[in-house]
Amino acid sequence: MADSSNNEKAKPLADSKLTLTILDLIQQSNNLGQLKKGANECTKAVSRSTAEFVVLAADAEPLEILLHIPLLCEDKNIPYVFVSSKSELGRACDVSRPVVACAVTVDDKSQLKSQITNVKDSLDRLWIV
Protein backbone atom coordinates (compact mmCIF):
# COMPACT_ATOMS: atom_id res chain seq x y z
CA MET A 1 0.00 0.00 0.00
CA ALA A 2 1.10 3.55 -0.66
CA ASP A 3 2.20 5.35 2.48
CA SER A 4 1.92 9.05 3.26
CA SER A 5 5.47 9.81 2.06
CA ASN A 6 4.52 8.48 -1.38
CA ASN A 7 1.46 10.72 -1.43
CA GLU A 8 3.67 13.75 -0.80
CA LYS A 9 5.84 12.88 -3.80
CA ALA A 10 2.86 12.18 -6.10
CA LYS A 11 1.99 15.73 -7.06
CA PRO A 12 -0.12 16.96 -8.77
CA LEU A 13 -2.81 14.42 -7.93
CA ALA A 14 -5.99 14.57 -10.03
CA ASP A 15 -9.34 14.80 -8.26
CA SER A 16 -12.03 12.21 -8.97
CA LYS A 17 -13.76 14.23 -11.72
CA LEU A 18 -10.51 14.94 -13.58
CA THR A 19 -9.43 11.32 -13.11
CA LEU A 20 -12.60 10.08 -14.84
CA THR A 21 -12.06 12.52 -17.71
CA ILE A 22 -8.44 11.43 -18.09
CA LEU A 23 -9.24 7.69 -17.93
CA ASP A 24 -11.98 8.13 -20.55
CA LEU A 25 -9.55 9.96 -22.84
CA ILE A 26 -6.96 7.22 -22.28
CA GLN A 27 -9.48 4.58 -23.43
CA GLN A 28 -10.27 6.56 -26.57
CA SER A 29 -6.57 7.19 -27.26
CA ASN A 30 -5.86 3.47 -26.91
CA ASN A 31 -8.57 2.66 -29.45
CA LEU A 32 -6.96 5.11 -31.90
CA GLY A 33 -3.42 3.86 -31.28
CA GLN A 34 -2.32 7.07 -29.54
CA LEU A 35 -1.29 5.52 -26.23
CA LYS A 36 2.05 4.33 -24.84
CA LYS A 37 1.65 2.03 -21.82
CA GLY A 38 4.18 1.35 -19.09
CA ALA A 39 7.04 3.30 -17.55
CA ASN A 40 9.58 2.39 -20.26
CA GLU A 41 7.37 3.30 -23.24
CA CYS A 42 6.25 6.43 -21.42
CA THR A 43 9.87 7.47 -20.83
CA LYS A 44 10.66 6.96 -24.53
CA ALA A 45 7.62 8.99 -25.63
CA VAL A 46 8.62 11.88 -23.36
CA SER A 47 12.27 11.74 -24.44
CA ARG A 48 11.22 11.87 -28.10
CA SER A 49 8.70 14.66 -27.37
CA THR A 50 5.87 12.61 -28.88
CA ALA A 51 3.76 12.72 -25.69
CA GLU A 52 0.87 15.19 -25.35
CA PHE A 53 0.62 14.46 -21.61
CA VAL A 54 1.63 11.77 -19.14
CA VAL A 55 -0.44 9.96 -16.50
CA LEU A 56 1.27 8.27 -13.55
CA ALA A 57 -0.12 6.03 -10.79
CA ALA A 58 0.33 7.43 -7.27
CA ASP A 59 0.09 3.94 -5.73
CA ALA A 60 3.05 2.47 -7.66
CA GLU A 61 5.35 0.49 -5.37
CA PRO A 62 7.99 1.73 -5.01
CA LEU A 63 7.02 5.16 -6.32
CA GLU A 64 10.68 5.88 -7.09
CA ILE A 65 10.43 3.75 -10.26
CA LEU A 66 8.36 6.61 -11.74
CA LEU A 67 9.96 9.71 -10.30
CA HIS A 68 12.36 10.21 -13.22
CA ILE A 69 9.39 10.77 -15.57
CA PRO A 70 8.18 14.08 -14.03
CA LEU A 71 11.73 15.43 -14.33
CA LEU A 72 11.83 14.51 -18.02
CA CYS A 73 8.37 16.01 -18.52
CA GLU A 74 9.48 19.30 -16.96
CA ASP A 75 12.56 19.39 -19.21
CA LYS A 76 10.42 18.79 -22.30
CA ASN A 77 7.53 21.00 -21.11
CA ILE A 78 5.04 18.10 -21.21
CA PRO A 79 2.21 18.17 -18.65
CA TYR A 80 1.88 15.22 -16.26
CA VAL A 81 -0.51 14.17 -13.52
CA PHE A 82 -0.85 11.42 -10.94
CA VAL A 83 -4.03 9.37 -10.58
CA SER A 84 -4.75 7.42 -7.42
CA SER A 85 -4.98 3.86 -8.78
CA LYS A 86 -2.70 1.80 -11.01
CA SER A 87 -5.52 -0.76 -11.36
CA GLU A 88 -7.90 1.83 -12.80
CA LEU A 89 -5.14 3.07 -15.09
CA GLY A 90 -4.59 -0.52 -16.28
CA ARG A 91 -8.30 -0.97 -17.03
CA ALA A 92 -8.39 2.31 -18.95
CA CYS A 93 -5.36 1.17 -20.97
CA ASP A 94 -7.21 -2.10 -21.76
CA VAL A 95 -4.54 -4.19 -20.02
CA SER A 96 -5.31 -7.02 -17.61
CA ARG A 97 -2.51 -5.90 -15.25
CA PRO A 98 -2.03 -2.65 -13.33
CA VAL A 99 -0.26 0.09 -15.32
CA VAL A 100 1.97 2.58 -13.48
CA ALA A 101 2.45 5.07 -16.34
CA CYS A 102 1.08 5.93 -19.76
CA ALA A 103 1.45 8.71 -22.30
CA VAL A 104 -1.10 10.01 -24.80
CA THR A 105 0.87 10.69 -27.98
CA VAL A 106 0.75 13.42 -30.61
CA ASP A 107 -1.35 13.00 -33.76
CA ASP A 108 -2.27 16.20 -35.61
CA LYS A 109 -5.17 14.54 -37.47
CA SER A 110 -6.67 12.98 -34.36
CA GLN A 111 -10.37 13.26 -33.55
CA LEU A 112 -9.34 13.72 -29.91
CA LYS A 113 -7.43 16.99 -30.42
CA SER A 114 -10.00 19.17 -28.62
CA GLN A 115 -10.38 16.71 -25.72
CA ILE A 116 -6.59 16.47 -25.34
CA THR A 117 -6.36 20.28 -25.31
CA ASN A 118 -9.07 20.47 -22.61
CA VAL A 119 -7.26 17.93 -20.42
CA LYS A 120 -3.93 19.73 -20.90
CA ASP A 121 -5.59 23.00 -19.83
CA SER A 122 -6.97 21.26 -16.73
CA LEU A 123 -3.51 19.91 -15.92
CA ASP A 124 -2.04 23.41 -16.25
CA ARG A 125 -4.64 24.69 -13.78
CA LEU A 126 -3.53 22.06 -11.22
CA TRP A 127 -0.15 23.79 -11.00
CA ILE A 128 -1.68 27.22 -10.38
CA VAL A 129 -3.33 26.20 -7.10
From Swiss-Prot:
GO cellular component, one term: box C/D methylation guide snoRNP complex
Xref: InterPro entries: eL8/uL1-like (IPR050257), H/ACA_rnp_Nhp2-like (IPR002415), Ribosomal_eL30-like_sf (IPR029064), Ribosomal_eL8-like_CS (IPR004037), Ribosomal_eL8/eL30/eS12/Gad45 (IPR004038), Ribosomal_eL8/Nhp2 (IPR018492)
Cellular location(s): Nucleus, Nucleolus
GO biological process: maturation of SSU-rRNA; mRNA splicing, via spliceosome
Source organism, top-level taxon: Eukaryota
Keyword line: mRNA processing, mRNA splicing, Nucleus, Ribonucleoprotein, RNA-binding, Spliceosome
Pfam families: Ribosomal_L7Ae (PF01248)
GO MF: RNA binding
Entry function: Binds to the 5'-stem-loop of U4 snRNA and may play a role in the late stage of spliceosome assembly. The protein undergoes a conformational change upon RNA-binding.
PANTHER family: RIBOSOMAL PROTEIN L7AE FAMILY MEMBER
Family: Belongs to the eukaryotic ribosomal protein eL8 family.
Protein name per UniProt: NHP2-like protein 1 homolog
Species assigned in the record: Dictyostelium discoideum (Social amoeba)
